[in-house]
C-alpha cells in the first residue's frame, strides 16, 4: 500500500480536498486503484448534526455515513463508493479509545495522546486504506487528507500519527504533499513568505514535505518556484503551480501539465504508465446550449448544495448544455423571479423556515408547466402543495412543521428516537419503479438503488386520494413512496432520495439528465413563442 498524505498551510479553504481528489485521478488515469481517507479534526462523531451554514453540505455515503463534502469530491473524481470508515474524526478516535479503556483493553495503563490516541489514528488510517471501495481488490494507493491547517491544535495528534507512520514505512511507500497559498501583491509579484512559514511549522512537527502545491490566482513562474524550493528543500520539479480554475474538473488536467503525476510516480516507485484520456474527454465536453435553473433554497451558501451543483454540471456536460444556477432565497423571492428560468429545483433540508416560499415555487412550476425537480424535502413539499391546491386540503403540512393535516408523517421507526446523530433513514435503499412512468424511462430499469437521508414520509392515509387526483407515485420502497410525478406535465418529478449523491462526470444521475433535458426543451419552446 502506498500513501499520499495531503496537508494544508497558511489558511483553510485552499482546496486540499480537490487537490487530493485530483492527484488520485491522475493515478487512476494511469491504471492504479485509488482510495481516499478524510481526517476531520473536530470533536463531532460525524458531520450529521453540524450546521450546514458553517460546515457546508453533509454528504451521505452508501452505508449511511454522514460525512464532509470532500468525500463527495473523492467519489465523483475517482468513481468509487466510500464507507464511513473513510472519514476519521477526533470524535470517533476518542470514542474508540475511551471504549477500549472501559473494557480494560489497555490493562490498567495510563491512557495518553501518545501512544494511545496516535495508535488509534494509525489503525483507523490503515483499516480504511485496506477497505475495498468498489467490491474489488484492495487499492494500490491511499490518499489521506488531513483537514484543517498546520498549526491548529486540533490537528496535532493526527500529524504526529502521520510522522510515526512516515518513519515506519519505506520512503517509497509514503509521500507528503503540502498545499499552501502563494498570494500576489498589488504590484503583481508572488509572495512566498507564507509558504516558507507554513513549511517551517510543518518541519517543527517532524514532517518534511516531498511536494508543494502552490495555490495562487495565476500560474507561478520558474523564479518563484526556485525561491520556494530554496527555502523549503523541496526540489523545483516538485513545486507545483495550481492556479484558480473556473471548473474543478479542469484541475487534474492542469496538474498533469505541471508534471505532478510524474513526480508522484517517481517518488512512490510506481510505473509511470501512459495516462488514459477518457475522463478528460468527458469533463472537457463543449457546450452548445445554455439553460437557467432556479434553486429555491434556505441557505445562501452554495457549498451547502455542492452535490446538486455538481450533478447539474454532470447532466449538462452529457447534454452539451451549460447550466446557469439562479439562487433564490426561499423567504424573500418573488414569483416574477421564476418567469424567465427554464426549470425550478427544490433541494433537501430540515425545519420550517422558508417552507411556504418553496411551496409557492412548486405551485408555480406545476401550474405554469415549468420543469420541476424536487429532492427529499422537495418531494415532501410537492406532495403538500398538491394536497393543498388540488385536493383542496388547505392546512396540509408535514408533521415536522407543526399543526395541520399531516400529509407528511414521521416514519414509524423514528417515533421513539431521541438522539439526532446517525438516526435517520440513511444510505442506500432499494427502490422499485413503475413501468411506463417518466422515472422508469430515465433509469431504463425498474429496480434501482439510491441514497437517503430523512425522518418523514408520505402519510399512507392520503396516497389513494392523491393518486385519484392525478399525482402518480412512480417509485416505492416497500410501503414507502419514493418518487412522484405528474403525467400531463412536461417534467414534474420529485424523489424522496438524493440522486445527486451517486452522480459523477462519467455517470450523470438520470433524474438530473431528465431535468436538464426538459429545461432545454422548455427554453426552446419559449424562444419559439
Curated annotation (Swiss-Prot):
Allosterically activated by GTP, when glutamine is the substrate; GTP has no effect on the reaction when ammonia is the substrate. The allosteric effector GTP functions by stabilizing the protein conformation that binds the tetrahedral intermediate(s) formed during glutamine hydrolysis. Inhibited by the product CTP, via allosteric rather than competitive inhibition. Gene3D superfamilies: 3.40.50.880, P-loop containing nucleotide triphosphate hydrolases. It catalyses: UTP + L-glutamine + ATP + H2O = CTP + L-glutamate + ADP + phosphate + 2 H(+); L-glutamine + H2O = L-glutamate + NH4(+); UTP + NH4(+) + ATP = CTP + ADP + phosphate + 2 H(+). Mg(2+) binds at residues 70, 145. UTP binds at residues 12, 191-196, 227. Pathway: Pyrimidine metabolism; CTP biosynthesis via de novo pathway; CTP from UDP: step 2/2. Its EC number is 6.3.4.2. The keyword Chaperone does not apply. GO terms for biological process: 'de novo' CTP biosynthetic process; pyrimidine nucleobase biosynthetic process. L-glutamine binds at residues 349, 377-380, 400, 455. GO terms for molecular function: ATP binding; CTP synthase activity; glutaminase activity; identical protein binding; metal ion binding. Keywords: ATP-binding, Glutamine amidotransferase, Ligase, Magnesium, Metal-binding, Nucleotide-binding, Pyrimidine biosynthesis. Homotetramer. Belongs to the CTP synthase family. Catalyzes the ATP-dependent amination of UTP to CTP with either L-glutamine or ammonia as the source of nitrogen. Regulates intracellular CTP levels through interactions with the four ribonucleotide triphosphates. CTPSs have evolved a hybrid strategy for distinguishing between UTP and CTP. The overlapping regions of the product feedback inhibitory and substrate sites recognize a common feature in both compounds, the triphosphate moiety. To differentiate isosteric substrate and product pyrimidine rings, an additional pocket far from the expected kinase/ligase catalytic site, specifically recognizes the cytosine and ribose portions of the product inhibitor. This is CTP synthase. It comes from Methanoculleus marisnigri (strain ATCC 35101 / DSM 1498 / JR1).
Amino acid at each position: 500500500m502506498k500513501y499520499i498524505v495531503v496537508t494544508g498551510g497558511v489558511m483553510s479553504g485552499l482546496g486540499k480536498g480537490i487537490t487530493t481528489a485530483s492527484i488520485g485521478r491522475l493515478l487512476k488515469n494511469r491504471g492504479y486503484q485509488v482510495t481516499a481517507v478524510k481526517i476531520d479534526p473536530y470533536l463531532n462523531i460525524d458531520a450529521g448534526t453540524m450546521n450546514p451554514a458553517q460546515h457546508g453540505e453533509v454528504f451521505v455515503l452508501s452505508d449511511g455515513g454522514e460525512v464532509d463534502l470532500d468525500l463527495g469530491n473523492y467519489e465523483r473524481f475517482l468513481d468509487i463508493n466510500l464507507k464511513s470508515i473513510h472519514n476519521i474524526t477526533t470524535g470517533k478516535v476518542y470514542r474508540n479509545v475511551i471504549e477500549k479503556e472501559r473494557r480494560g483493553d489497555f490493562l490498567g495503563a495510563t491512557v495518553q495522546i501518545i501512544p494511545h490516541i496516535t495508535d488509534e489514528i494509525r489503525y483507523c488510517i490503515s483499516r480504511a486504506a485496506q477497505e475495498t471501495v468498489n467490491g474489488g481488490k484492495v487499492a494500490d494507493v491511499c490518499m489521506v487528507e488531513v483537514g484543517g491547517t498546520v498549526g491548529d491544535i486540533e490537528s496535532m495528534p493526527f500529524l504526529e500519527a502521520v510522522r510515526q507512520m512516515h518513519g515506519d514505512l519505506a520512503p517509497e511507500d509514503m509521500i507528503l504533499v503540502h498545499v499552501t497559498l502563494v498570494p500576489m501583491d498589488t504590484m503583481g509579484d508572488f509572495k512566498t513568505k507564507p509558504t516558507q512559514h507554513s513549511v517551517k511549522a510543518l518541519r517543527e512537527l517532524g514532517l518534511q514535505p516531498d511536494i508543494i502545491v502552490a495555490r495562487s490566482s495565476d500560474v507561478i513562474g520558474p523564479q518563484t518556484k526556485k525561491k520556494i524550493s530554496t527555502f523549503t528543500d523541496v526540489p523545483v520539479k516538485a513545486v507545483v503551480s495550481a492556479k484558480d480554475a473556473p471548473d474543478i474538473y479542469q484541475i487534474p488536467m492542469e496538474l498533469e501539465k505541471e508534471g505532478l503525476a510524474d513526480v508522484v510516480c517517481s517518488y512512490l516507485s510506481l510505473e509511470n504508465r501512459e495516462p488514459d484520456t477518457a475522463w478528460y474527454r468527458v469533463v472537457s465536453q463543449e457546450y452548445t446550449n445554455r439553460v437557467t435553473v432556479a434553486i429555491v433554497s434556505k441557505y445562501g451558501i452554495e457549498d451547502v448544495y455542492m452535490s446538486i451543483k455538481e450533478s447539474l454540471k454532470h447532466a449538462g456536460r452529457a447534454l452539451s448544455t451549460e447550466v446557469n444556477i439562479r439562487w433564490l432565497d426561499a423567504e424573500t423571492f418573488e414569483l416574477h423571479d421564476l418567469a424567465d428560468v427554464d426549470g425550478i429545483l427544490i433541494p433537501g433540508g430540515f425545519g420550517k423556515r422558508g417552507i411556504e416560499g418553496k411551496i409557492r415555487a412548486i405551485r408555480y412550476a406545476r401550474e405554469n408547466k415549468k420543469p420541476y425537480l424536487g429532492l427529499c424535502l422537495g418531494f415532501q413539499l410537492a406532495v403538500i402543495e398538491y394536497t393543498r391546491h388540488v385536493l383542496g386540503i388547505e392546512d396540509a403540512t408535514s408533521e415536522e412543521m407543526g399543526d395541520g393535516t399531516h400529509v407528511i408523517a414521521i416514519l414509524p421507526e423514528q417515533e421513539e428516537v431521541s438522539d439526532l446523530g446517525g438516526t435517520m433513514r440513511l444510505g442506500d435503499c432499494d427502490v422499485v419503479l413503475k413501468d411506463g412512468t417518466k422515472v422508469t424511462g430515465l433509469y431504463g430499469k425498474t429496480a434501482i438503488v439510491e441514497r437517503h437521508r430523512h425522518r418523514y414520509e408520505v402519510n399512507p392515509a392520503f396516497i389513494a386520494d392523491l393518486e385519484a387526483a392525478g399525482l402518480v407515485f412512480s417509485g416505492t420502497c416497500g410501503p414507502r413512496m419514493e418518487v412522484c410525478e405528474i403525467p400531463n406535465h412536461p417534467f414534474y418529478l420529485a424523489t424522496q432520495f438524493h440522486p445527486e449523491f451517486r452522480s459523477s462526470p462519467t455517470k450523470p444521475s438520470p433524474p438530473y439528465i431528465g431535468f436538464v433535458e426538459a429545461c432545454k426543451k422548455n427554453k426552446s419552446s419559449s424562444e419559439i413563442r
